[in-house]
Amino acid sequence: MFDLNQSLFLRALRRQPVERTPIWIMRQAGRYLPEYRKVREHAGDFLNLCKNPELACEVTLQPLRRYALDAAILFSDILTIPDAMGLGLYFAEGEGPCFTNPLQDTKAIHALKIPSIPESLSYVFDAARLIRQEMPKELPLIGFSGSPWTLACYMVEGGSSRDFKRILNLIYTEKEAAHLLLNKLAVSVTAYLTEQIKAGVNAVMIFDTWGGVLTPQNYKDFSLAYMHQIVQQLKNEYPDIPVILFTKNGGQWLEWMAETGCDALGVDWTCDLASARKRVGGKVALQGNLDPAVLLTAKNCIRREVGSVLASYGYGTGHIFNLGHGITPDVPPENVAIMIEAVHEISPQYHL
């Protein structure tokens, strides 16, 4: 029987020798694939797709059928936890995620209940079990959650935001309420990732999409502290499950992030991979960091830029190739194949 620990992805995460650099793609199950669009249309809307384990399983498997990827990522949304807390998640056409009951004052934060994660988000764990059963046995499955800070941003703003005025006002003027909210979310995220691990995921990733809007001290206090808490609790219970942290626009804080006890850091395209490796490569693996815009260019440009990312990381293990953020819906599927082939062809020379 195949030992999943021998997979390229898990070996690279643990900084063990590999024959080539593993690759997966953030949002690899997504709107750039015509087969995904067909299933989403059948589901009626994005949330129905997330809440239907069979359909979530199908779209998770689609990119694996099309491409030689080294891991699958559970198909879900980062806002399932706030939805389970009763905020009423919905997706407005062209606007992204919104809540019918955003947290409009400190009273709402005090009243917010920590949900029973196994019951309220059972559809996520059912999907994870089904995916693990149906997907290739030799490939790892990645589970994920939004970070407490990122979830709080959406919950207080009521959806996406350009300036995050409400949540930033909260941390400056109602510090205690902000910490109460983040603590409730940290407890929920820990329970959520624990249940995903029980359902069969082989690694977990915490997406801190909005950590980069904070000052350094506020990042430490309101984002990193809670991710640290989650990592410690997961590692206490599941020391062998790798944890990846990703703060978008957080390249200046890699040293702090590496101190949390996580196994790897995701880096976006604004971060120089060679200097990131010098700074924290002795402690953690690095995942990234091709600019997603490269996938909208021609074959020779894609190959050149893939080569640049691989050369920037350099020789040896500890690198998982990925984009610096999620793949965009306008990417031609054939360009993804060009990127993956380039990683397969160019990376072995760095692992001799």
Curated annotation (Swiss-Prot):
It is found in: Cytoplasm. It holds the Pfam family URO-D. It catalyses: uroporphyrinogen III + 4 H(+) = coproporphyrinogen III + 4 CO2. Its main location: cytoplasm. GO terms for cellular component: cytosol. It comes from the Bacteria. GO terms for molecular function: uroporphyrinogen decarboxylase activity. Keywords: Cytoplasm, Decarboxylase, Lyase, Porphyrin biosynthesis. Its EC number is 4.1.1.37. Pathway: Porphyrin-containing compound metabolism; protoporphyrin-IX biosynthesis; coproporphyrinogen-III from 5-aminolevulinate: step 4/4. It is an enzyme of class 4 (lyase). Substrate binds at R27, Q28, A29, G30, R31, D77, Y154, T209, H325. Belongs to the uroporphyrinogen decarboxylase family. Catalyzes the decarboxylation of four acetate groups of uroporphyrinogen-III to yield coproporphyrinogen-III. NCBIfam families: hemE. HAMAP family: URO_D. Homodimer. This is Uroporphyrinogen decarboxylase. It comes from Legionella pneumophila (strain Paris).
